[in-house]
Amino acid sequence: MSGVSEEDPEGLAPQGLPALGGACLATMDKKLNVLTEKVDRLLHFQEDVTEKLQCVCQGMDHLEQDLHRLEASRELSLAGSGSTPPTTAQAAWPEVLELVRAVRQEGAQHGARLEALFKMVVAVDRAITLVGSTFQNSKVADFIMQGTVPGRKGSLADGPEENKEQAEVAGVKPNHVLTTGGVQADASRTLWEESQKEDIPVRTVEGLPLIINTSLKGADLTQAGASLRQGVEVLGPGQVPLPTEAESRLPETASENTGATLELSVAIDRISEVLTSLKMSQGGGQETSSSKPDCWLSEEAMRLSSGPLPQPLGPLTPDSDIHSGDALPRIPINMQEMATPGELLETQSGSPIGSAEAPGLGTVLEDQIPKGARPFPPLPKRSSNNGGMSAEEEIGSGAEPMRGPSLATRDWRDETVGTTDLQQGIDPGAVSPEPGKDHAAQGPGRTEAGRLSSAAEAAIVVLDDSAAPPAPFEHRVVSIKDTLISAGYTVSQHEVLGGGRFGQVHRCTERSTGLALAAKIIKVKNVKDREDVKNEVNIMNQLSHVNLIQLYDAFESKSSFTLIMEYVDGGELFDRITDEKYHLTELDVVLFTRQICEGVHYLHQHYILHLDLKPENILCVSQTGHQIKIIDFGLARRYKPREKLKVNFGTPEFLAPEVVNYEFVSFPTDMWSVGVITYMLLSGLSPFLGETDAETMNFIVNCSWDFDADTFKGLSEEAKDFVSRLLVKEKSCRMSATQCLKHEWLSHLPAKASGSNVRLRSQQLLQKYMAQSKWKKHFHVVTAVNRLRKFPTCP
């Protein structure tokens, strides 16, 4: 007894479910067959449409050639006949009418453009008017344009004659201002009267080659300020005297001979007097021979430094009113520099005035007087770190601190160009008598911080993670032409870009546009070779992706095909692996691998298998960038579902196990090649390379590979996981291109870059965009505020 009943010899009676499952599978198989047939019909329909488009293109080419021939024959007939027959002239009338209509249409278009331009000009005019009204209603604009200072009277428009008349009517002696440098100093009326009563001797000191006249020239004033600064440098650091009253005031009445000028004899004589006494006390330690004793100078300097400044300084105004409301006459002074030192200072009245090594008329160097009897203490030196130190901190306890902003000082860097630097709110000790002391006195903290920041910026490497640039031409459907390539292109036979089993690639140039292209010359021997080239052209006609090379034109001859393609000059990716001057990091490999996966993903979306992916078939866009393009679609095949495709070609070390075993190929076949390329980029080694091709294929069939301990030391586990999930013998277990792009290793590039002390270019562009957006936002806010300011404000 076998244990099986006679009624059911096969033992299948109680098993009803398997039979039902078989019926379901049969139904599913039928549906799959129907779906396969539909897909095949769609593919055939697509091929038919492509062939018809090619026929249409060829017909258009033939029609264009016929039109050219017809035009040539018509031109020959016109040249042969001496005069145009009436019928030809009548036939040309409609063309003339069409040209006239076209001219009228263009005229109407130009009129519309002119009208739009006129509207734009009107809008700009309104905007300018709005800006002008806003600027006029602004107090800052009044301060800049008219020279008015809050709490003062007068402006730049006031003339010297009017101010002098106002001063005479008021009957009060005004405080005078040296207008050459915009410097103002307040002095008490007691000092002014004492100086008027005294008989000031005339002194002469050699060393200041200046002649002061009473004509107004702005350029000469700046030269005078620079020359007087040279006189200050002779005294040495820390020994510049304080400005006394005589330095900051001018004679009251104008000269009778020239009604618009004032003598400077008293002020310059006081300068020469003070500095001569200082020089004599330094040279021989003798007693100074000034018209007033040291105690008077100390008292006078103390009054000047501690006297209250009733009004803040305004811009460089040649005439400003005193606090009592009286007008101050403008003093036009012309300073002319002489080449020979030792000349005398002369006024227009002809009396020689002793020159002195003093601060320039356009510059007043200040200092504080501590308690004690020394009239001229040295200038305290400070660095830029204590730029906020006020004058009250440096003045002695016995003296009253100076109130109001300090006087304007002239920066030594601007003396050569004659500009004036207003340094309001800076203590007088900040003025360095020697020009070279400014930068030398800066604190080391800022310098060290600048060095550290510059070193940190230099250490950060910027990686360009942007997408590959598109082809310099629009995507086109190319039809193979049977004309000569030399008619439209110039092929450089001596400049070979690459080569392989198919032939060679030369650089070429389009004659009409000068566009640089690449010419791939493929040798054909039989009908099968021609079909393969046509298949390559058909596949490239369907590809339009930045990581895939683009086809531009195609030509056919008796023994070869020439494909005109996009040109890139970065070289093969294989060179990046083998060349010692290129040091690939893991982040570089991430950028390369991601673009390879994007190109393969596009191919697989269009049911195309590349089947020959390797570093030699991947070109870099530039010598140092990270943008790539996949080339060589000669072995590419269209993948058709339910159609068992087998291939027996390819480079041995990049072949998938199913290709070596001559099994069916599909999308995972390309992903195996992607895994091999990634392994090579990470380590520089080939995972399956043997001494012979047979040994290499044996390693591939057995999937015999591992991570080299030395080369993969220090690489992330994510990179190893990425390679391990691609180099799998079973096709269904490999990652697809979509899964590769979603893998952790190819994601989160900014975080990986920050961990590697690398900055991505996309991050820089984003930061720049955010900064520009923020700037625009602030600009709009300021614009809105300025528009609101056009409304009248309360007085």
Curated annotation (Swiss-Prot):
Cofactor: Mg(2+)
Domain Protein kinase: 491-746
Catalytic activity: L-seryl-[myosin light chain] + ATP = O-phospho-L-seryl-[myosin light chain] + ADP + H(+); L-threonyl-[myosin light chain] + ATP = O-phospho-L-threonyl-[myosin light chain] + ADP + H(+)
Region feature (Disordered): 236-257, 305-328, 367-452
GO molecular function: ATP binding; calcium/calmodulin-dependent protein kinase activity; myosin light chain kinase activity
Annotated tissue distribution: Restricted to cardiomyocytes (at protein level). Down-regulated in heart after experimental myocardial infarction at the protein level; no significant changes at the mRNA level.
Function as written in the Swiss-Prot or TrEMBL entry: Kinase that phosphorylates MYL2 in vitro. Has been proposed to be calmodulin-dependent, although MYL2 phosphorylation has also been observed in the presence or absence of calmodulin. Promotes sarcomere formation in cardiomyocytes and increases cardiomyocyte contractility.
Name of the protein this chain belongs to: Myosin light chain kinase 3
Species for this entry: Mus musculus (Mouse)
Name of encoding gene: Mylk3
